[in-house]
Amino acid sequence: MKKNTLLKVGLCVGLLGTIQFVSTISSVQASQKVEKTVIKNETGTISISQLNKNVWVHTELGSFNGEAVPSNGLVLNTSKGLVLVDSSWDDKLTKELIEMVEKKFQKRVTDVIITHAHADRIGGIKTLKERGIKAHSTALTAELAKKNGYEEPLGDLQTVTNLKFGNMKVETFYPGKGHTEDNIVVWLPQYNILVGGCLVKSTSAKDLGNVADAYVNEWSTSIENVLKRYRNINAVVPGHGEVGDKGLLLHTLDLLK
């Protein structure tokens, strides 16, 4: 990865909080009832939505260009503690998110994986450091974070890094430039779940969104690299918008044409 481009403080965007009300969504799959829970805070700025027993999507509502925009990450419930994929817009939301999930699961957040150096991903880095939570990132993301005025994450992730948190296997992958120079994706091989982050657009997205730091001419190649590496995908979590499947990657390619 080249380290010569300064990212502007941009956003990918978010929705999260404290545990105040629970709504249950029922669906029938293979003649078996599956309960999926959504937990929100009082103000609706923070929510966590269940994908399966051990994987939840966290969503925070942040502000970008004067508009409220929801931003997604993950909560991984492992045998050794909780792991987040991305923090939130700022320290206030990140603190509230951490308190919310630690109360829900009765476990401590031990690690966070930062997928790039925009505010909606790394905005809570100060809170992470204050709480002794390990913030994993690529070296490029750490460098760009410092340039953008944030405290540095660890910079310990390579092009491909395989991690294990208790019973949870996690792979991080740098597919190339796209939404930013440093964007990575996160793969959960036990569930075939891909966290596309802001590299991947939701089906409701009509354009590429914030492209202040984008490499539009290289973005398609990076999406193709993800498709080549992960051929059996059950679910894709975009940086913003609804969870989908492999079709989100194909939709992103269409937007890039």
Swiss-Prot record:
Monomer. Belongs to the metallo-beta-lactamase superfamily. Class-B beta-lactamase family. Zn(2+) 1 binds at H116, H118, H179. It is found in: Periplasm. It comes from the Bacteria. Confers resistance to the different beta-lactams antibiotics (penicillin, cephalosporin and carbapenem) via the hydrolysis of the beta-lactam ring. Active on cephalosporin and penicillin. The keyword Metal-binding applies. GO terms for cellular component: periplasmic space. Residues 1-30 form the signal peptide. This is Metallo-beta-lactamase type 2. Binds 2 Zn(2+) ions per subunit. The enzyme can also function with only 1 Zn(2+) ion. Keywords: Antibiotic resistance, Hydrolase, Metal-binding, Periplasm, Signal, Zinc. The keyword rRNA processing does not apply. Pfam families: Lactamase_B. GO terms for molecular function: beta-lactamase activity; zinc ion binding. It catalyses: a beta-lactam + H2O = a substituted beta-amino acid. Zn(2+) 2 binds at D120, C198, H240. Coiled coil: none annotated. Inhibited by captopril stereoisomers and iodoacetate. Also inhibited by chelating agents such as EDTA. One of its GO terms (biological process) is response to antibiotic. Substrate binds at K201, N210. Its cofactor is Zn(2+). Its EC number is 3.5.2.6.
